[in-house]
Amino acid sequence: MAPRPLRWILPALLLLAGWSESRAQEHGVLLGLRYEEPIPKPLPYYAGDADSLSRAAYRTLLITKSDETFVVWPEENDLLIPHGNTFWRAGSKRSIYNNWVEDFVWAAPDDASPSLVGIQPYNGEFCEGHRKQSVLYASPQFLSLDQQSAGYCEGAAHPWFFNTLAVVPLDSTTHTGLSIADVLGEAAYEALENGVKSFLDGLENERRAAYIEEPDAANWGLARREGRWSTLGRLEAAETATRSASADVPLALDLPPAFTGPHPSSLLWTHIQTFAPDAVDAFVAPEADWLILLRPDHLAIHPVADGAIGQVALTVPVAPGTRAVMVQWAVDAPLRRWVEHVDRHNRQSN
């Protein structure tokens, strides 16, 4: 299980009352995290690369600031994604059919049961292998998924290995993937073409031949890189029987705020790394007056004044290898709705 956040800061009901009466600007962030959850017993089935005794799991933390007070609210299982005045929830479900294993990503309104896709009978009856999805990015409109599949079916000439990216609508996790141009415009597809060309031009002919040179407009994604959201394209292997012959290509593309949220320019990644050389990621508040550092085994919350990072105010333990997949900021009334929702859900669960 992932380490639990700090629940003892203040009783939730007292905090909620204080927030309702506060006149100071209140701002906070819903932070969605992906980590590897151990499986407590050996797997009784063939799973290829997925046979790691772990699977992707997700948790959401609401962290708020009012005046100089920081609060880490009780965590939510899965990804709690703000969607207008309501919430959606996204997570992962492992399914097993004989020697075939699939980790599905699902999404549904928070007050509804998710529709879980089952394994196709042919795969379960005649194939051995796995298909694994994991979330790289989550927003009110889209999910960015990393998809891996490997296996062998009876009568096939050889095994297969696929590593692809897909950006799908939040309400359609079975979608095969949206074109980068449909989501970000034609200039984004040009950035994909240019990025792939630059990458291939830097390879020797023998290595270059390992890839399909024409980029797939739907094989792209969003992920965290140096404290920001960035776009990347994935080049597919020219031969599907070749293991791991795919390559991720960063794209020279400025994402609009609708995808990234605000990011103050006063705190550069180089400055953050000077302060914390082991920082994995950083999340800077819209007013640049506080930030959260993701370090190898914990989150560290720091005040910021005049561009200078202050001493740590709170820490939250995280599992090794934790990565951020959602960063959603809010202030005042929208944030109070988030606080009320998380507090109400926590009281209903206890």
Regions found by a protein language model. Give the residues of each.
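Short coil/turn segments that connect the beta-strands within blades of beta-propeller domains
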Residues: 28, 140-141, 288-289
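Residue position within the beta-strands of beta-propeller blades
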Residues: 31-32, 144-145, 293
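Hydrophilic extracytoplasmic domains
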Residues: 249, 253-350
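Acidic, serine/threonine- and glycine-rich low-complexity intrinsically disordered segments
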Residues: 129-278
